[in-house]
Structure formats: C-alpha cells, structure tokens
C-alpha cells in the first residue's frame, strides 16, 4: 500500500511511496540504503506474484530501473515529477553506469542500461534478441581466445563479440544469485468453446469446405524443435528446394493423413525485422503467398524469448495456432504452464506437444485445420498498454500511423498493424511497398519523434520494450519456470570441457579427428569399397550383355564408358557424403557446432569471416562438395560467398592420390613431407586469398557474431537420418549433374578425333590434341 514498504524488501533498501494529500497521487519517492531492488531478483518476483493492493502505482522491474537510472517517477504511465536518487544505485558503492558488457566479470550479474550501435539494423537485432534496457544479464564465460563472450539472459545463452558488447552499458553489478527460489503455484483456467468455431471473435462465418486445399507455414526460433516437428507432420512426404531469388532452403511437405494440407518449413528466425535473409524470406512468404494458417512452434523451456516472434507473427493477421514444444522437459524440471490462460491472453489456440516423442501432434493438426478452415485470425493485435509506463505514447503513435496508412496498406496487401509497427522501426522494405508520398512520410516521422520525446526513449527500444513488457506480464500470470533445468546444468558441465580455456581446442581436434577417421577410414571407406565393387560388377555385366546383344561399339562405349562410368564415379562418393553428413548432423543437433563457432570465431575474424565458417572449411579437407553444400546454413551472404571461394584451397581426400603421384615422381626421397607441405601451402594460400578478398571484393565491416548457444540435447535418430538423406539427395541432384556431364564430355573427347572418327589409339583423340596444346604452354623451356 502507498506509504508502506513492501515486506519482502530488506531493511537496508526500504522503498516508500508517500501520498500527495491534495491530488491523491504518489509523489516522488524516498529510497534509503544500498541495493535498491537490483541486488536480489526475488524482491521483484515476490512483488510480481503478490502485488500491492494499489491501483495508483504500477510496480515493475523495468519501471524501477527507469526510476533509478533516469530519475523519473512513473505512475499511470506518466512522468509526474523529477526526483533525485540519493542512494547508491544497483548494489555497488560508487557510480557504475559507465561499465560496459565487455568488461563484466565472469559470474557477475548486471542490468542493461543502454544499447548503442552505429549500425541501426545490428542494434535492432540486439534488442530483438532480448538485450533491452532493464534486462538482467549474467556473464557466463569468455571464449578460449578471449573473444567472443557468452552471457545468460531471459533463460538462454547468447554469444556476441567484445566490440559489440562494448556498446552495451550496464548498471547494478552484483554477484549471481545461485540460491534456490520458491515457485508460486498457478491454477488452471477454463477456456470455453476451443475448437468449435466460436473460439475467436474474428472467425469467418462460413468455413472452407471439407477437402479444400489448405497451406500452412511452420515458423519458429532456431533450436526450438521446428525440424523435428516438420518431420513428424510430413514423414517422408517432403521435398527440399529454394525460396525464389535466394539460397535459403525451403522445405515443403504434405501433412500425413491429410493429403489436402501442405506445409512449408520456414527458416529458423528470431524476429521479422529485415536483419537476415531468412527473416526477409519468412515474412515475404507469409505476406505474398498468404498461407491459410501459421503454425508457430515455441520452446516451452524458454517461452519469454520465443513469444517475441509470436507477437510479430500475430501482427500479420493470419489464422494461427501455437505449438508449445518440449513440455515434457518443463514438467520434468518442476515447471508449469497454464495453457488455457496463455491462449486466452494471446487470443490464439495453444497446444502443448513434444515433437521428439510425437506427443500432441494429432491435436495440433486438428487445431491447425480448424483455424484454417474457419479463418480464425488472432483475437489480439495490440500489445501496448494505453496507460503503460510510457504514458501510452507508443500506443498513440502506432494507432496514429495506422489510421494514416490504412488505405496504402490495404492496397499493398500488408496488414495495417504490422505495417504501422514496421514504419516505427524504420523498415525500408515496408516503406517502399506502401508508396507513401513525402508529406505522409514527414507526418509519420513527426509522430514517431513526438513519441520518442514523450516516452523518453528511442523508437527501437520502445518497440522492443513494449513487446517484452507484454510478454513479461503474460509469463508472470501463466508460467512457472524452474530455478534451473537439468538440461542447462548438464550443458554447463559439458561446456567446462568443450569450451574451456585450455580444453576446447584439444577436445575439438579429438572430436573432428574421430569423425574424419570414422568417415574416411572406417565406416565411409568400407561402404565406399562395397559401392565400388557393386558398380564395377554392374558395369562388367552391362558390357558383357551389350557385347552379346551385338550392340554397336560406339553405342556400347557410350553406355559403358560414358554413362555407367559417369554414374558410378558419382555414386562412389555417396557413402562418404552420407556418413560425413550423418556425423555433422549429430554434432549440429546436439548443440556442439554452435560451440565450435564460438571457439573459433576470433581466428576467422582476422580473415573477414565468422566462427560459423570454420566447420565447412574443415569439412573441405574430407570432400569439397559437402563442404560447399554446408555453407548454405551460414546466415550471412558475405560469409557464404567467402567460405565457398576459400573452401577449395583446403585439399580434399580426392586430391590425395594426385599428390601422391606427383610427390612420388618429383620428391622420391621425401614423399610424405612433400605431401604435407602441399596441404600447408593450400592453407596458407587460402589465408592470403581471404585477406585479399576481405580488402577488395568483400571489403567492409566484419559480419556480427550474435548467436544463441542451445542446451546440449540427444539428437533425434529420425531427424538426423532424414537430414543426412536430404543432403545426400542434394548431392545427387546437383553434383551428379555436373560430374555426369563432365564424364560424358571426356568420353567423347577421348573416343573421337578431329574428324569425328572413332580412334583406336587415344593418342590421336581430341583429348590428346587438347593436351598437346596445353603442353606447349606448360612444358619447361629446353636448356
């Protein structure tokens, strides 16, 4: 109550809200002692769970942060008065608002005060990842080479480089609270009429006829189980392609037992802001192809972060259902989610599932078909409170812009709320699509500038804060999070070795050495030998059969030496490709590949690359084809192109026989050292080429390294096998075409002479003639 200290506050951090007798409203508060609420998270959790019976004052973590760091009193969402905070803020003696994230000690907690960056797109991406002012972060560790660093926020781990972390100011530095915390119990909430056509007040009056084609978009964050869910939905009824105009993978499939329902697996993203190609592709797919419904998969172990994308998907105003994945982990760790209350607050159906265990998939499909047939759009599109801490400034801003651009948005087939929000963000793609004139653009900029002045913050921070505030309120009412999950505890223990300062690189060498040995020396080599024997037997049988049939020698040679030999040369690579991708899929699904990028980022950054490029180049020592194919997973076009151009410098296993032949001929006394030197020369030349390219064709700032580090998980056998098979099919359909065509061309050149007569002696063939021409320019001059 006003005028009283909350009982959960310690004696040295009493907080009082005196009442103004004339107005009946709170006046500037008094704070005594050190700590002021930041020292201990339970203080604010207790206040959230047991709020004071007072309607005049809204108490929130970020509200108190604003009071302590910006000297403002917030009540009814308005700044009533300026106050001086005499207490030492944030649990540390002396002023500490100049501390940067890159200098935070390991094991310390702090609160984000501000996020700065010259690159507004990068700054928005950082905010979208949850690093908003008022967010508590914990420094987990630094990479073995000192850069990048790993922090924990909003229940997950995030990595970023020191250069980017240096732009993030912190306050409230204190030791991490590792003690157990009691979880408040949540009840159950009845939700009426779900699945009966009356759930959403915005449903269509007439349903789509039974059996009519329906198309779904599957969206979600990275590492939330989206691929596993897609495989459960479609089984083997899927194919892989590209989104138009980009190299981003597109997976389409048909939902099992529902031949009329197809689904597209969109790339894993964290936001619909145009920071990455995947984000642009995902939102353009929804806007342009207008799927009948969106299936949004959420990691139930980290609802807070995942809901950030959910709110943006809801703004697209398409029928939608939420798949709350990994609920088995939540309950196993003592957590709980009031699913009915969650879907009531969001206005969309929520279905708890476990994709890995194939639990709840049938119910999810039923709900998805229902919202698609009845066109049940989200019941809520507005997430900013009119009486929020910013005084409703953002609410008025978005609604004012929405009224101004409504006609343009309808013409451009863009949802009005989504368009208004993106204009506040400064989204150039949406601005161009709306075709606004100069007067309208000036009016919109004036509205946004006025909002920034009233809210006391910039536009990007205001939007991110609005979404996370709504999410925090929702999660506070219907989610009980365990203090620490078993998966996270296990991951921390494993990371002590796999990302440890002195053990990370040796562990990496051991793991990749084992993968290469099993691929090229044991499993892959054995399967390749069996494949070669089988192909040789098929070619011999075909040759004998064609001879017995009396087939023309040229036709027989084309079939045997051209077609079958060409196909065989491709297929002999297949066992290596499958086994290598199988191991890489296991490492990726387990979460280890993200750690490799974290460990190696500092080395590759010197050459203009990020740590994600290390694994494709390493795979290049085994086989260049799968190495180049694996670059498609890199998030940056800059990284993809650079990695593709540098990977061939890593000598693959197919070059080993050639190296052996040349070294044996020219260096008979030192064959092994000569072969090793060829590998080293290739690496050195690749590094030099990277430096040259980074200063010429790919000149510019290095690509930021902002990446989530997921918990270690046991890979799904089904998902891993299907991923390896997809890569194998990709190899067959792409590399096969080139290699097969090259084989046929070589057969033609070595079979015919310049008059297109069949040659008995290949020294008279076209191929020999081309070799003679090359010899003129490559043979040493006579002494």
Label each region the model flagged.
Residues 537, 596-618, 700-722:
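Juxtamembrane inter-helical linkers in multi-pass membrane proteins
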Residues 777-782:
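Conserved small/polar residues in nucleotide/adenosyl-binding loops
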